[in-house]
Amino acid sequence: MSIQESAAAYESATQYFLNLARGVMKDQLDIKNPEGWSARQIIHHLADSEAQSYARLRRLVAEPEGSTIQGYDENLWAVAPQLGYESAPVENSIAVFAAVRAGSLDIVNRLEESDLEKSGVHTEAGHYTIAKWLEGYTNHPKDHGDQLVRALKGLN
């Protein structure tokens, strides 16, 4: 897939998740099933994950090859009461997701094919290229968008 096709897929995934998240009604936010997160938790997770992705892409672009790309424990973040996954309004998280994705897309649109092989060392995943970043963060909102649909249907 060319960088232009990858950028288009990244943007499409952004719009897919935003359309779903913006369509969740307030009385649907806390629909939860035993195996998964509620719609509220999914939306907050996507905002936090994208904040991580924003920093990761910039490190991969700007820092020397082999720089450390920090992981994080999403499950710990999800249960930290101060982060509000269980209760905070989702509007700010939707705005963060949209803004961060737009900023990252600007960078993706300036990449050249050769940039896709720039790499760092992810603390959990090991060797980590811009291509791997792009693939992962293109799929991530699609996967969680599908999870959001299932949560609203009461399935997982």
Model-predicted segments: where are they?
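Alpha-helical structural elements of signaling/regulatory helical domains
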Residues: S2, D48, Q52, A88-P89, ...
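Solvent-exposed, charged/polar functional surfaces in cytosolic regulatory/catalytic domains
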Residues: Y16-G23, V100-I107, D143, Q147
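Short acidic/polar alpha-helix capping motifs at helix-coil junctions
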Residues: Q4-A7, N19-G23, T68-Q70, A80-E86, ...
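Solvent-exposed interaction patches of small proteins and small membrane subunits
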Residues: M1, E5-A8, I31, A62-E65, ...
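Acidic/histidine-rich alpha-helical segments that form the ligand environment
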Residues: A9, A13, A78-E117, Y137
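Alpha-helical bundle segments that constitute or directly flank the non-heme di-iron/ferroxidase center
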Residues: M1-K26, A51-A55, R59, G136-H140
